Amino acid sequence: MINMRKTHPLMKIVNNAFIDLPAPSNISSWWNFGSLLGICLILQILTGLFLAMHYTADTATAFSSVTHICRDVNYGWIIRYMHANGASMFFICLFTHVGRGLYYGSYTFLETWNVGVILLFATMATAFMGYVLPWGQMSFWGATVITNLLSAIPYIGTNLVEWIWGGFSVDKATLTRFFAFHFILPFIIAALAMVHLLFLHETGSNNPTGISSDADKIPFHPYYTIKDILGALLLILTLMLLVLFSPDLLGDPDNYTPANPLNTPPHIKPEWYFLFAYAILRSIPNKLGGVLALIMSILILVLMPLLHTSKQRSMLFRPMSQCMFWILVADLLTLTWIGGQPVEHPFIIIGQLASILYFLLILVLMPVASTIGNNLLKW
């Protein structure tokens, strides 16, 4: 009798995606982050669902309801902190996953890559709206500052901002709709992740060499299932260390003060995972220019396949490109640091130089390094 997992209409989909899937024999731990992102998403949906059972999306009670979750709900504190720090783990995995794609040339899978960029935007939108929900000072002012950026759009800007707000400022209507969107978006992300996986399985996985691995494939189960379980255990260990020992390490103390439209915090800043983009936004004195730079800082990923000038796919055997890649990583860390600093000397000029270097590296220096690499190998 043929195995049921290979014949059953539902089980064979799972089988072809996670069990009998032919996988390259040499993919490293950098390939673990896709499955870790899936785990993060499931964890966020589950903890978020339990939080939504006790949360009220109303300006008068939102802050109190979060306090109630932490004080009165059974294990509410751990659910709340798992959700908040789970977002940080999500973005660590996301940035690593994208970095892996850049380093090993995975962006040559065009559809997979483009769906991935859409996933990144959707996740960033979800995280931003989630940060508004506790209705603390940084929630309110973060929402005000970021939504206000849309007013830089010529002609329709002001109307667009007021339409998103549902009034003339960030208020009850804004909070209610942000909760609605924050609830629905993770399910859209889950659907997009399935599309992402669908396109990936059309081509099969890339591998560190960037060479076709069709000649040497192994089944996903048990080899990569056990490897993914190890990754998942390490992820959960890191998350729980964060949650149980320093749950507020990555948060902002200002968010423990209820939102007050009459009192602006001295330094408005987003969560750490948006600081690099925030630094790029602030480094341009012009409002519209800053908004465009902010969007382009992420949208530039779409251009990666067009900017690939090397004859090799992966950076594994390209020392010059590797050097540029790690300079880019260092630059992003610098931007993250600058985004959390006040707007004063010397942080302004450092932020501007780091922003220029960011775009220069991706648009000019990395393609040039690839071309020089080709010429050195007489290609």
From Swiss-Prot:
Gene Ontology molecular function: metal ion binding; ubiquinol-cytochrome-c reductase activity
Principal location class: mitochondrion
Binding positions for a ubiquinone per the UniProt entry: 201
Entry annotated with the keyword Heme: yes
Keyword presence, Magnesium: no
Alphabetized Pfam families for the sequence: Cytochrom_B_C, Cytochrome_B
Cofactor(s) the record lists: heme b
Residues the record lists as binding heme b b566: 97, 196
Residue positions binding heme b b562: 83, 182
Family annotation (InterPro entries): Cyt_b/b6_C, Cyt_b/b6_C_sf, Cyt_b/b6_N, Cytb/b6-like_sf, Cytochrome_b, Cytochrome_b_C_euk/bac, Cytochrome_b_N_euk/bac, Di-haem_cyt_TM
Spans traversing the lipid bilayer: 33-53, 77-98, 113-133, 178-198, 226-246, 288-308, 320-340, 347-367
GO cellular component: mitochondrial inner membrane; respiratory chain complex III
GO biological process, one term: mitochondrial electron transport, ubiquinol to cytochrome c
Protein role: Component of the ubiquinol-cytochrome c reductase complex (complex III or cytochrome b-c1 complex) that is part of the mitochondrial respiratory chain. The b-c1 complex mediates electron transfer from ubiquinol to cytochrome c. Contributes to the generation of a proton gradient across the mitochondrial membrane that is then used for ATP synthesis.
Complex formation: The cytochrome bc1 complex contains 11 subunits: 3 respiratory subunits (MT-CYB, CYC1 and UQCRFS1), 2 core proteins (UQCRC1 and UQCRC2) and 6 low-molecular weight proteins (UQCRH/QCR6, UQCRB/QCR7, UQCRQ/QCR8, UQCR10/QCR9, UQCR11/QCR10 and a cleavage product of UQCRFS1). This cytochrome bc1 complex then forms a dimer.
Family: Belongs to the cytochrome b family.
Name of protein: Cytochrome b
Taxonomic source organism: Antidorcas marsupialis (Springbok)
